[in-house]
């Protein structure tokens, strides 16, 4: 097998991608491709936990029912059943790998989270994602069959034209574009929160896997369903940090810039209304009262809570806010809603197989059907582990004989990176603002149509960039050696902007198509949930259609 030939190429180094590497058969040669340094994915940021029905008083059936209730009629019952019944084994495997979950004595500690009927959420202090990713990374680095390519950017999938099979991926790495030929490609690139002006996702969450798959003809679905958290610490230059709903549960007030407690203007329960209601209240209040609502905040005032109780209940929030210059005992926390989790993704079955043979997807990149229209808390890390476990049984066809003599010729190209920088940076600044205002927490047909028209204009301009004309249609049988000022930074900016423009178009199209409100999708002009829309929104190429839901509720 040649240097650029692999059995499986895994794209993404969060919990999903790392665990996939560990679950793939040990005799497979695996390439792990990650566009940044390791441990910059969203699962490393996950403060929440991982859910499993392991308590004597709990059951997979109860976990199943809670998941379906949260999913607002769009969960796939078979996928949810698979998830909850494999959850205890997933926890056992993580413990065996060395993840140190919190314990009460000899027993794993379980906490109760929103919309769960039983305490079933395991934590590793308040940084569960980091604990899992750190442990898995150590295991992957020790695997002799896994070759890690850091700061490598996936550009396009290699689809065999006669069979339609995915046979590899084109990658920019070490200032060279080359094709990694493989028997399968697994996309585990996380979500796309950077398409919105406010997000809890890290900078690398630009929807890469979903964009790559869609451009290659894979089916994607339910992309209108995005979960927004109502209260994230929001300061210029500071990464968004979630302020738990428990803070409002203890009595904290939401105030606007004038000091008005405004939440009761939108719902009789005020700050204690459901998460999506509070998010909409803040979003609408900022739209009504601020000149630039995409950059504005409201304030979470903890003064009604006794200081001793704050210290006992929220030590991590105290520490993190203080680190970013906010003393919560002396001042309110500036907060705003933020895009948090993308329920939709590349359509897959329970074996991670997409609609393209040889192409697999996992984690937030995939749409397995377990989340429906609204994810149940702490099911996302679980989904990564449970579905990755299926890859132990992965059987692949031989590498195509045409791939045995590849990348022999090298072509050198100098890229003038300065020409296109202004437009690329303009889109990276303006696209998240446009999406936040038109496809964020509150949507309506008129503004969605306006945004789609703007996106179509930007897409046409993107295709006319000198860099796009040069890079978008490179031959797969050549290595391309690139040079130019600031090349690595430019290539990441170019590729991510391409992906963000595409996923923005997909979100807008799906949101306009669904003429109702359900789960993580709210239409001001269609505020009711309608039985006839209890179906998945599917996009395949330019075709948009409904697919009946397999929900068992």
From Swiss-Prot:
Necessary cofactors: FAD
Compartments in which it is found: Cytoplasm
Chief location bin: cytoplasm
Residues that hold FAD according to the record: 13-16, 35, 42-49, 208, 364, 380-381
Entry note: cofactor: Binds 1 FAD per subunit.
Substrates-to-products reaction catalysed: L-aspartate + O2 = iminosuccinate + H2O2
Site (Important in orienting the L-aspartate substrate): 113
E.C. number: 1.4.3.16
Keywords: Cytoplasm, FAD, Flavoprotein, Nucleotide-binding, Oxidoreductase, Pyridine nucleotide biosynthesis
Pathway(s) this gene product operates in, as recorded in its UniProt entry: Cofactor biosynthesis; NAD(+) biosynthesis; iminoaspartate from L-aspartate (oxidase route): step 1/1
First-tier enzyme category under EC: oxidoreductase
Single GO molecular function: steroid dehydrogenase activity, acting on the CH-CH group of donors
Active site as annotated: 275 (proton donor/acceptor)
UniProt superkingdom: Bacteria
Record's GO cellular component terms: cytoplasm
Gene Ontology biological process terms, A to Z: 'de novo' NAD biosynthetic process from L-aspartate
Alphabetical list of InterPro entries matching this protein: FAD-dep_OxRdtase_2_FAD-bd, FAD/NAD-bd_sf, Fum_R/Succ_DH_flav-like_C_sf, Fum_Rdtase/Succ_DH_flav-like_C, NadB, Succ_DH/fumarate_Rdtase_cat_sf
Role, per record: Catalyzes the oxidation of L-aspartate to iminoaspartate, the first step in the de novo biosynthesis of NAD(+).
Family: Belongs to the FAD-dependent oxidoreductase 2 family. NadB subfamily.
Name assigned to this protein: L-aspartate oxidase
Originating species: Synechocystis sp. (strain ATCC 27184 / PCC 6803 / Kazusa)
Gene (name only): nadB
């Amino acid at each position: 097998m040649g240097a650029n030939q692999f059995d499986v190429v895994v794209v993404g180094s969060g919990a999903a991608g790392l665990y996939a590497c560990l679950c793939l058969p040990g005799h497979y040669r695996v390439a792990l491709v990650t566009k940044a340094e390791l441990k910059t994915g969203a699962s490393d940021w996950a403060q929440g936990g991982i859910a499993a029905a392991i308590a004597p008083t709990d059951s997979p059936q109860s976990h199943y029912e809670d998941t379906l209730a949260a999913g607002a009629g769009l969960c796939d019952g078979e996928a949810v059943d698979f998830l909850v019944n494999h959850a205890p084994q997933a926890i056992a495997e993580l413990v065996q790998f060395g993840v140190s979950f919190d314990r009460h004595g000899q027993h794993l500690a379980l906490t109760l989270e929103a919309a769960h009927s039983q305490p079933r959420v395991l934590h590793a202090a308040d940084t569960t994602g980091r604990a899992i990713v750190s442990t898995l990374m150590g295991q992957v680095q020790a695997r002799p069959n896994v070759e890690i390519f850091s700061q490598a950017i996936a550009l396009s999938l290699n689809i065999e034209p006669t069979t339609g099979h995915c046979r590899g991926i084109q990658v920019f790495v070490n200032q060279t574009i080359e094709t990694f030929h493989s028997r399968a490609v697994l996309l585990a690139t996380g979500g796309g929160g950077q398409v919105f002006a406010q997000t809890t996702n890290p900078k690398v969450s630009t929807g890469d896997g979903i964009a790559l798959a869609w451009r290659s003809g894979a089916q994607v679905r339910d992309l209108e369903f995005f979960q927004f958290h109502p209260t994230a610490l929001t300061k210029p230059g500071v990464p968004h940090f979630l302020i738990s709903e428990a803070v409002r549960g203890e009595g904290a007030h939401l105030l606007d810039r004038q000091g008005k407690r405004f939440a009761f203007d939108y719902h009789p329960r005020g700050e204690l209304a459901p998460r999506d209601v509070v998010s909409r209240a803040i979003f609408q209040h900022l739209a009504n009262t601020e000149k630039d609502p995409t950059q504005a905040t409201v304030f979470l005032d903890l003064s009604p809570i006794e200081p001793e109780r704050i210290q006992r209940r929220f030590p991590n929030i105290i520490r993190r806010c203080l680190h970013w210059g906010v003393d919560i005992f002396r001042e309110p926390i500036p907060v705003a809603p933020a895009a948090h989790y993308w329920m939709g993704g590349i359509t897959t079955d329970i074996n991670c197989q997409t609609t393209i043979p040889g192409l697999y997807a996992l984690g937030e990149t995939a749409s397995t059907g377990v989340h429906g229209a609204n994810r149940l808390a702490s099911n996302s890390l679980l989904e990564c582990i449970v579905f990755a476990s299926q890859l132990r049984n992965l059987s692949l066809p031989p590498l195509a004989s045409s791939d045995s003599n590849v990348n022999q010729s090298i072509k050198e190209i100098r890229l003038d990176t300065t020409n296109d920088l202004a437009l690329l940076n303009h889109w990276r600044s303006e696209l998240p603002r446009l999406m936040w205002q038109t496809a964020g927490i509150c949507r309506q047909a008129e503004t969605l149509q306006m945004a789609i028209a703007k996106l179509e204009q930007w897409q046409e301009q993107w295709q006319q960039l000198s860099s796009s004309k040069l890079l978008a249609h490179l031959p797969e049988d050549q290595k391309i050696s690139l040079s130019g000022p600031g090349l690595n930074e430019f290539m990441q900016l170019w590729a991510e902007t391409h992906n963000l423009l595409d996923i923005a178009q997909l979100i807008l199209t799906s949101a306009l198509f669904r003429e109702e409100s359900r789960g993580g999708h709210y239409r001001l002009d269609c505020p009711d949930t309608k039985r006839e829309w209890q179906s998945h929104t599917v996009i395949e190429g330019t075709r948009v259609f409904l697919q009946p839901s397999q929900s068992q509720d």
